[in-house]
Amino acid sequence: MGEENQPNYTISQENWSLHRKGYDDQQRHQEKVQEAIKNNLPDLVTEESIVMSNGKDVVKIPIRSLDEYKIRYNYDKNKHVGQGNGDSKVGDVVARDGSGGQKQKGPGKGQGAGDAAGEDYYEAEVSILELEQAFFRELELPNLKRKEMDENRIEHVEFNDIRKTGLWGNIDKKRTMISAYKRNAMSGKASFHPIHQEDLKFRTWNEVLKPDSKAVVLAMMDTSGSMGIWEKYMARSFFFWMTRFLRTKYETVDIEFIAHHTEAKVVTEEEFFSKGESGGTICSSVYKKALELIDNKYSPDRYNIYPFHFSDGDNLTSDNARCVKLVEELMKKCNMFGYGEVNQYNRHSTLMSAYKNIKDDNFRYYILKQKADVFHAMKSFFREESGEKMA
């Protein structure tokens, strides 16, 4: 086919400066939204509307507007104060507030109506997905190791191939223009035009198998009578974000839910997050159940194991020594053990008093005193390691 019969493709050009204003405003808006998410993240993660949601809802957060200059009349321009009549002494009042002793004007705060303008802001809708991206960016399972690589592999899609045919949405513009330039240069006219069918280049993908390691997280929660509404809400808030984090970042992580009072039992995820119980507290029961699960179902040779236990620390005193012994036994089989204690009023905790004597780098604990501590507990338990990550 001669070159005159080749289908030609053109390169269009537009004065994008006409559209720049809207684009800049949109970019600035997005930057302010991301800044607001970052600043409000500790409080947002414990919003009841999020924790009790189906994961598809949106939340509203305040976005402060840009400060703008305002022109106002200076009502005090004719009010001046002089030195006096010459009889001034040390300590004499030589000037007073021009408002005549009246209360300073300002925006309303709390009770009573204010008489000055407040700070402008509006509420932006943010999806839970955006919160997750900001929250989970620096989190990872600690001490994750390779186990049974050959039996456990995941599929991953990568755009790593270039072909002459493909979807128009995947056209590689740079390679296409370079190909056209080279072909035109060989004919004596070095330019990007015309572009022929043979110059087109398309990016395409291949499915890549990557080795991955199995892991199991044992979510253990105290549901005894001493765990009040606030304590259970805090514990469930942590486990809500923990499960979303694990399922977002890892494809081969199992989660077992264990609830306990004086006895422990494996429950469904729905029961774990909704069912309430009462009774006394014997924390050793949940550690025995965790060890039983590991022995029967999750061998340390095949799984990375992470137990997390949340309680108010109000345990039967005679049971504390048994708890320490079982926790030490668990740590021999696990990558890390995490203990979270919900203790709003900083009261004496029999369980924490015993756990503070555990000297092991794989034992981590965090005391939650306010809602924002759910965020900080997640950062503490799942902080990025400084060492080399597992590929």
Curated annotation (Swiss-Prot):
InterPro entries xrefs: Spore_YhbH, UPF0229
Signal peptide stretch: none
Protein name: UPF0229 protein BCB4264_A0587
NCBIfam families recorded: spore_yhbH
Biased composition (Gly residues): 98-115
Organism encoding this protein: Bacillus cereus (strain B4264)
Residue ranges, annotated region (Disordered): 1-31, 80-117
Biased composition, class Basic and acidic residues, residue ranges: 21-31
Record's compositionally biased regions (Polar residues): 1-16
Pfam families found in the cross-reference section: DUF444 (PF04285)
UniProt record similarity statement: Belongs to the UPF0229 family.
HAMAP family recorded: UPF0229
